């Protein structure tokens, strides 16, 4: 039977791993969102490149944490949300330019819906009464709002890429705050 001190040390170690993971997610999304915000062109080609970069960074980051045994397979389920989006956005870059916008809209809608599903699943698994569960639920709801907006609203190219950039910044700030917040009480 582990002592109370060793159990507490394990909890602190796990909390630090979660914070590191969230911090790396923030580092991946904030620069991409800022790039979109301050870059003059807001065409679907820029959106697709940023979508590929974001989904690739998220998928590789989750995979790296999984391989380094810093998270379990259940915690790495969000990788499943990013891989199809990465493949779609990379596939889209090799299509005629006329198809970029439709594929960008599809990719972002897919990202939003899949991320919402997997983050929501993880939030429920972790427990909504925990800080990590609430952070995951917030991520799921923001992603769901993005996915539904891209599915329902009629957006032009500039608005669509701008909303995606805003999503990246919002997620980056949320994950940054979550990673810098002291452990659960």
Go through each PLM region and give its residues:
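Structural signature of hydrophobic alpha-helical transmembrane segments
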Residues: 42-57, 99-113, 161-169
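Hydrophobic alpha-helical transmembrane segments in multi-pass integral membrane proteins
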Residues: 88-98, 143-160
